[in-house]
């Protein structure tokens, strides 16, 4: 549990006649101060000459700290374990006193392959973490394969700069589980239905293109000619009216998209989809060369009856931006998500292509700001990544599926920055040739 520094009583010796804080005289071992804030101590001598000294207390790595306790080990992705949650927000974020919570594992390869485990927590009541919109459920991404810790954060930033209706937010925090430091985690919002998340209202659907071996036993899905589509929300049963409604609508959209007059503005795919959402989803995943987004998984879309099908939210980029060694997605050159069946067909429509070029030009114009953000996040993690590596010792060794191995965090970040620049330069030229 964190020691309180909001009312800390310092001891000191001075060479002078008086010491004050904000004009108030101070006595050693007597006057409490709030050291979550920067303080200015002024020392004066008998002649009235004074000097001021800034006190800036930095706790641990400077990141907020989350303390989780569990009644038993977290060994399952399916079953919650009872526990507690406490957030020490330090000076940057609102702290949250200890409250009841439930904790379970999450993820697929990230859960089964790596020792640093990702978690999902469910608070006893809705709370805002790090200024994000309040909710009960929060994800703790371990970012074990991504030694920069920044790829998901970078993708989320691209999403926030796009026309996508909602993109998850996340913030870094040190995490202690049962008083054992488990390193830095990326605490994020979950892709789920909710007023403050994917707002599909009472009648909408949140869907995910997925794979049979990734489904849970109670998942309900349907298959188009091209994809297996998992109905994430709402809860439906096979054959009921809601199941039939969404299956028939998505199937009809795909039939029209792959049909003869697919680009007709009134009767083709434009009548069915929010085109800008498809374009921005495509561009973000293509810039990242996100290995799973071509056809495999974490491809989300949502639809409210009476409206158009929208792509998104974006999700799962720890193996993006070249961080994969088993596919051409390793390299910053070459198309990848462009070969997604739906996107590939839309790129046969000249109007779609022109809009893609316009949207990419807007994104590329923001590249200096994006790179500045990336450098700022890396600086924010300057102390934290060192503590994280002290625990997990991933620097300088291969972690699945890293295509390159560097000895230092700075080299890992530089590689990501260089890869991003090369990728965006390549896409700028390649789009002109479409």
Where do the protein language model's features map onto the residues?
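Short, well-structured beta-strand/strand-turn elements
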Residues: 17-21, 162-174
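Structural recognition of the beta-strand scaffold that forms the well-ordered cores
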Residues: 118-122, 138-142, 149, 157, ...
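Short strand-turn-strand beta-turns centered on an Asx-Gly dipeptide
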Residues: 22-23, 88, 178-179
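Beta-rich interaction/scaffold domains
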Residues: 1-63
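Internal "kinase-insert"/substrate-recognition segments embedded within catalytic cores
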Residues: 122-128, 142-144, 164-168, 180-283
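Conserved NTP-binding catalytic cores of kinases and kinase-like/nucleotidyltransferase enzymes
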Residues: 58-154
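Short, solvent-exposed loop/turn and secondary-structure capping segments
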Residues: 132-134, 151-152, 185-187, 194-201, ...
């Amino acid at each position: 549990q964190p020691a309180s520094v909001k009312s800390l009583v310092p001891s000191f010796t001075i060479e002078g006649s008086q010491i004050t804080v904000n004009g108030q005289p101070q006595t050693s071992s007597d006057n409490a101060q709030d050291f979550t804030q920067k303080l200015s101590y002024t020392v004066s001598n008998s002649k009235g000459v004074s000097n001021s000294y800034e006190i800036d207390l930095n706790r641990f790595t400077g990141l907020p700290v989350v303390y989780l306790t569990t009644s038993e080990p977290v060994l399952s992705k399916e079953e919650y374990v009872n526990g507690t949650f406490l957030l020490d927000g330090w000076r940057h974020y609102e702290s949250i006193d200890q409250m009841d919570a439930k904790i379970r594992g999450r993820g697929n390869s990230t859960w089964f392959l790596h020792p640093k485990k990702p978690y999902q927590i469910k608070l006893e009541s809705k709370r805002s973490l790090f200024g994000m919109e309040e909710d009960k459920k929060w994800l703790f991404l371990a970012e074990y394969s991504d030694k920069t810790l920044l790829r998901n954060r970078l993708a989320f930033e691209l999403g926030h700069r796009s026309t996508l209706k909602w993109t998850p937010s996340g913030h870094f925090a040190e995490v202690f589980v049962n008083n054992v430091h488990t390193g830095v985690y990326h605490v994020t919002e979950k892709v789920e239905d909710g007023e403050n998340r994917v707002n599909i209202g009472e009648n909408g659907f949140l869907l995910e293109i997925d794979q049979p071996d990734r489904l849970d036993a109670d998942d309900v899905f349907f298959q188009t000619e091209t994809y297996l589509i998992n109905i994430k929300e709402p809860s439906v049963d096979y054959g009921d009216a809601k199941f039939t409604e969404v299956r028939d609508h998505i199937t009809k959209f795909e039939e029209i998209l792959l049909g003869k007059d697919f680009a007709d503005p009134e009767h083709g795919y434009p009548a069915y989809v929010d085109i800008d959402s498809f374009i921005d989803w495509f561009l973000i995943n293509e810039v990242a060369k996100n290995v799973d987004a071509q056809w495999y998984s974490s491809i989300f879309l949502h639809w409210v009856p009476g409206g158009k099908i929208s792509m998104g939210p974006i999700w799962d980029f720890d193996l993006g931006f070249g961080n994969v060694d088993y596919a051409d997605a390793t390299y910053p050159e070459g198309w990848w998500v462009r070969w997604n069946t739906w996107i590939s067909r839309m790129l046969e429509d000249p109007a779609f292509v022109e809009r893609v070029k316009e949207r990419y030009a807007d994104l590329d114009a923001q590249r200096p700001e994006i790179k500045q953000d990336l450098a700022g996040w890396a600086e924010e993690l300057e102390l934290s990544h060192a503590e994280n590596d002290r625990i997990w010792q991933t620097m300088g060794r291969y972690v699945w599926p890293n295509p390159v191995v560097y000895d230092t965090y700075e080299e890992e970040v530089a590689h990501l920055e260089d890869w991003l620049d090369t990728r965006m330069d390549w896409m700028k030229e390649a789009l002109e040739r479409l």
